[in-house]
Amino acid sequence: MPAGKIYARRLTVLAVSAALTVTGFLATAPSAQAAMPTPVSAATARTYLAALTVKAEGSTSGYSRDLFPHWITQSGACNTRETVLKRDGVNVVTDSSCAATSGSWYSEYDGATWTAASDLDIDHMVPLAEAWRSGANSWTTAQRQSFANDLTRPQLIAVTDNVNQAKGDLDPAKWLPSRTAYRCTYVRAWVQVKYYWNLSIDSAEKSALQSILNGC
């Protein structure tokens, strides 16, 4: 992927989304649940959706999760997963290695609440394999690492582990959160991430996204 194109896209997103702020690393967990960065509005998501390249989904040939290095160190002893667990939880306590030893987490996808970090996965809103089939196969390793550890866009969220596993690498034409109240947020986030990272969509994916955005 030409570096100039993706960086130009990033500048456009920054201009449109100037109100969004990056969730910072916290030395101690907040007393109330934080959240992933707020997605763009439905109106902005519809504008982004119209600008995305629509084409048949590519092949998974050559794909490996190892081509998207994660989880990388974010601050001190904390890697990306641990940072998201602290951000998304309530009263999270961590040990000296930054592993969460206690806390409470609400899974937006299914409405379940968990008190053990082992019951949670950190979901890539746009899955790594989906990104690969949508253009990330041509990225550099550095670009794929940035995508896989992106804390600035609404790309990473702590959710029930088996729900994340059921989602797998499916796009919104084939999978949506069972908690219908979250679907508008989900597709707004999906579109924002795809737009920022200059990833394509297929026709069925676009139809599913458009249908939900029209009801937001």
Where are these regions (language model features)?
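N-terminal module-boundary/linker segments of secreted carbohydrate-active enzymes
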Residues: 25, 32-75, 203-207
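Domain-level detector of nuclease and nuclease-like folds
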Residues: 105-216
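Alpha-helical transmembrane segments and their juxtamembrane interfaces
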Residues: 19-20, 86, 134
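Residues that form generic nucleotide/phosphate-binding pockets
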Residues: 48-52, 66, 83-87, 131, ...
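Secreted/periplasmic proteins that engage bacterial cell-wall peptidoglycan
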Residues: 54-128
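Secretory targeting and sorting signals
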Residues: 1-35
